[in-house]
Curated annotation (Swiss-Prot):
Gene label: RAB28
Name of the protein this chain belongs to: Late embryogenesis abundant protein 31
Entry comment describing in which tissues the protein is expressed: Embryo specific, only in dry mature seeds.
Stated family: Belongs to the LEA type SMP family.
A single GO BP: response to lithium ion
């Protein structure tokens, strides 16, 4: 075999930023073998097996490539993974179970499993303390977002969705000073100037106790959900909503209210 035909080692390692939507220091870290092993173990604990095409599979492929390239060695672990953990968490939301995978505190994978209406109704009562005879309100749906996306840094799409929700809850286009919409916009503006996700204001900081922060509240309807989804989409450069985010929670609440006919 001539020198030109010799297989070449990759010039650079496969990093987290190459295969996942992560930011900050983690994005530049090569994926290490023990990181992949920890994710495989975490997926197996939750699902009973590793997910086909899931984070563990992606990480294993990347770690193997990095070992072949000589960038990492068997037994190596990324410092952020070792310090902050590799975890898989499950959260029940109206009509679905959301499974989220984390490395070093950042999301690297998410799966949404639809759930039957009866199960969803019972779950909603447990999560937000609702009577099954009462409709889910906008404030309660916003609070449910804390369960599914509380650690997400607030961006302009979140702020727009929260503003749309507050407008519909209060029945006025006037944004109340110090309300959740104003707080969300302030958080989004602040976060746009910050590089590290760890230093950014999160949804939990804005939406915790949302019901008590609204001047008024109302049961979520399909029209409310459509307005919130539209606002989040218009302000997202990718024209998508965030899994488990504000629009998703409002939509799930509206769907449950319709199915329960309350």
């Amino acid at each position: 075999m001539s020198q030109e035909e010799q297989p070449k080692r990759p010039q650079e390692p496969v990093t987290y930023g190459d295969v996942f939507e992560v930011s900050g220091e983690l994005a530049d870290k090569p994926i290490a073998p023990e990181d992949a092993n920890m994710m495989q173990a975490a997926e197996t604990r939750v699902f009973g097996h590793t997910q086909k095409g899931g984070a563990a599979a992606v990480m294993q492929s990347a770690a193997t490539a990095n070992k072949r390239g000589g960038f990492v060695h068997p037994g190596d672990t990324t410092d952020l993974a070792a310090e902050r953990g590799v975890t898989v968490a499950q959260t029940d939301v109206p009509g679905a179970r959301v499974t989220t995978e984390f490395v070093g505190g950042q999301v690297v994978g998410q799966y949404v499993e639809p759930r039957p209406v009866a199960t969803a109704a019972a779950m909603e009562a447990e999560v937000v303390g609702l009577s099954l005879q009462s409709a889910i309100t906008i404030g309660e749906a916003l609070e449910a977002t804390v369960q599914t996306a509380g650690n997400k840094p607030v961006d302009q799409s979140d702020a727009a969705a929260i503003q749309a929700a507050e407008v519909r809850a209060c029945g006025t286009n006037v944004i109340a000073p110090g309300g959740i919409a104003a707080s969300a916009q302030s958080a989004a503006n602040h976060n746009a100037t910050i590089d590290r996700d760890e230093d950014k204001i999160k949804l939990i900081d804005v939406l915790a106790g949302a019901t008590g922060k609204l001047a008024a509240d109302k049961a979520v309807t399909r029209q409310d959900a459509e307005g919130v989804v539209s606002a989040e989409l218009r302000n997202n450069p990718n024209l998508s909503t965030h899994p488990g985010g504000v629009a998703a929670s409002i939509t799930a609440a509206a769907r449950l209210n319709e199915r329960a006919d309350i």
